[in-house]
């Protein structure tokens, strides 16, 4: 059976870029960006922010349940699947529990120095409201992960410090 990868991390750590590059390494692969699935909601989408209400939690759960179904279908057809999703400090990505049971599942946390995420955010978004919104997400995720990384490693997560790395 082909591999399944979940790449997670804070905003602006290179999840999508890394996921695409990883998927290209396999002869038959698919990249599933969870943000793209969430953007399929045309009316009523709720974006993560300082206030996580039940509606947001429900939408994230629904997106991840659909991603799980996509992963199972593609993987059953012989595709290597690479998911990219942000680290969710509320659910700890337990919506993927079904996939976590698979022996071919690899959970990868991209964890560069926070300064690198901040720099990438500013370069990508420029100054302004979007950059500030993403910077807030970076602070929240890094605040949580600073103490959580050892637990994640014990749970089988591969933690990759990408501070001085690029996808090449």
Label every PLM stretch briefly.
Residues 7:
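Hydrophobic anchor at the beta1->P-loop junction of P-loop NTPases
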Residues 58-102:
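Glycine-rich phosphate-binding loop used to anchor ATP phosphates in small-molecule kinases
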Residues 16:
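Walker A/P-loop
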Residues 101-122, 160:
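Conserved phosphate-donor/acceptor-positioning beta-strand/loop module used by diverse small-molecule
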Residues 13:
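ATP-binding Walker
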Residues 10:
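P-loop (Walker A) phosphate-binding loop of NTP-binding proteins
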Residues 20-66:
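Conserved substrate/cofactor phosphate-moiety recognition/catalytic segment
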Residues 126-168:
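Small-molecule kinase domains that catalyze NTP-dependent phosphoryl transfer to phosphate-bearing small molecules
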């Amino acid at each position: 059976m082909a591999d399944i990868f979940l790449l997670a991390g804070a905003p602006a750590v290179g999840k999508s870029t890394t996921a695409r590059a990883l998927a290209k390494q396999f002869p038959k692969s698919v990249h599933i960006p969870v943000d793209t699935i969430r953007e399929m909601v045309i009316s009523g989408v709720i974006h993560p922010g300082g206030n996580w209400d039940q509606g947001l939690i429900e939408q994230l759960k629904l997106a991840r349940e659909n991603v799980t179904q996509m992963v199972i279908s593609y993987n059953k057809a012989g595709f290597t699947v690479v998911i990219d999703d942000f680290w969710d400090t509320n659910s700890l990505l337990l919506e993927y529990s079904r996939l976590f049971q698979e022996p071919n599942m690899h959970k990868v946390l991209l964890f560069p120095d926070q300064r690198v995420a901040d720099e990438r955010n500013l370069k990508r978004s420029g100054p302004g409201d979007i950059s500030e919104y993403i910077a807030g997400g970076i602070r929240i995720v890094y605040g949580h992960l600073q103490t959580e990384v050892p637990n994640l490693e014990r749970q089988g997560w591969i933690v990759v410090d990408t501070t001085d790395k690029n996808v090449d």
